[in-house]
Regions:
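Basic/polar N-terminal segments that are highly enriched at the extreme N-terminus
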Residues: 1, 16-21
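Sec-dependent N-terminal signal peptides
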Residues: 3-14
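Beta-sandwich/jelly-roll carbohydrate-recognition scaffolds of carbohydrate-active enzymes
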Residues: 19-242
Length: 242
């Protein structure tokens, strides 16, 4: 009887593990044919891609642009504030200088997860989510581990699709935040003036974990830090599009 109970428990554990694995889809070949899988929350959809930190599009749900006098209305692409880039010792991290690339779609956690080693100096892991309880918001959580002593810089910029009018950029200092922390907001009218869309973003990190810089000429914000071998640092980028 005891053996039967143990066998049932073992079968149950194996079944639960199999069910959990069924929630996840994994890719490890960055050179294979690729189709992005979006994360969405009913308000916005975010489309990650295979290149490091790449986000191809942000789509606004049920927001349509007038097609003009003789055109057809279509879903409006959103302003994209989720663009990040990483430099290690002043060298840009790109697809050609990374190894161990892996992407995972965790359907249970509603997360798109990417990991890789870059320049033999850092191990990077980041996840992209469209926040469930904030319908116009998304978040990118990033973890960087130093494989050797190095300096890292992360740059955030905002992309305005070409079908928009002239953009306007505003930098707002965060109340109650750390000295020098800002949120960057970019607003622009849609082509035919049907909507005015704003994309905003800001970094979130532990106090004194990074040096923050406001790059108005480049229309961007950045954080940087020197890491010692074996040291791990984490931060997040929060963004909204509405």
């Amino acid at each position: 009887m005891r053996n039967i109970v143990l066998a049932i428990l073992l079968f149950t554990c194996v079944s639960l593990a199999a069910q959990d694995n069924g929630w996840k889809l994994t890719a490890t070949d960055a050179d294979a044919a690729y189709v992005g899988a979006p994360v969405a929350n009913g308000g916005i959809g975010i489309l990650p891609w295979k290149e490091p930190f790449s986000v191809r599009h942000v789509i606004l749900n049920h927001v349509f642009e007038n097609g003009g006098k003789h055109g057809v209305s279509r879903v409006l692409r959103g302003i994209n504030p989720f663009l990040l880039s990483l430099k290690v010792d002043d060298v840009a991290v790109e697809g050609k200088n990374i190894a161990g690339w892996r992407q995972e779609i965790d359907m249970k956690a509603a997360a798109h997860i990417t990991s890789f080693d870059a320049l033999n100096k850092v191990k990077v892991r980041y996840s992209i989510r469209a926040l469930r309880n904030m319908p116009y918001a998304g978040m990118i959580q990033v973890e960087i581990k130093a494989l050797e002593n190095c300096a890292v810089q992360v740059l955030q910029r905002t992309e305005v699709p070409k079908e928009y009018g002239v953009p306007d950029t505003v930098y707002t200092k965060m109340k109650g935040g750390q000295a020098g922390q800002y949120v960057v907001s970019v607003s622009a009218p849609s082509r035919y003036g049907t909507h005015k869309v704003t994309g905003s973003a800001g970094f979130v990190y532990e106090k004194k974990a990074f040096d923050f810089r406001l790059l108005k000429e480049a229309g961007a914000i950045s954080i940087s830090r020197t890491l010692q071998k074996g040291e791990t640092v984490k931060f997040a980028l929060l963004g909204t599009v509405c």
